[in-house]
Amino acid sequence: MGNIMDYLKWRGDLTFSQDAFNEVDNLLLSYVAYVNLEGLSVGAGEEQVTLEELSRRFFVLHSEEELAADKSFTRLAPYIVKMMAQSNRYRTSIISNYVNMVNPQLELQFSAVQLDLSDGSKNFCFRGTDDNIVAWKEDFNLGLGEVPAQKLASEYLNRFGAVSYTHLTLP
């Protein structure tokens, strides 16, 4: 059975005008939200860069040794994004409006990034639960009612022009 890396090898040469956006593309774009983009100048109000440039900057900033030491379940995200950045399908996607907030006292974890694709569509990717304790506490709190990240997700989408909302933004 194939995986998303196989998809990148199989369909990465095709632009969105040659093969329309699909569910696997959506899954791949979500990986961008799991990469630590701190220090890459793509925060809200900062630069807009291509995925190709973002990947280049990331691997200049982070050594292979540092990445190899990462044992989290999201450790492959930078490598998947690197493969995406080398493909015709994603390399020219514009990355912007990165936000990353973690506040243990508020039991808050919120991270989002905007990707503008070559077909003119805007995609807003949110980081879900990763392997830090704040994220897991927030997951448990979801069962009790609204969590701060839900409000932040709604504000993020309103600020950056999304017309539809994700699960995280639903009341």
Predicted regions and their residues:
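Conserved small/polar residues in nucleotide/adenosyl-binding loops
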Residues: 166-171
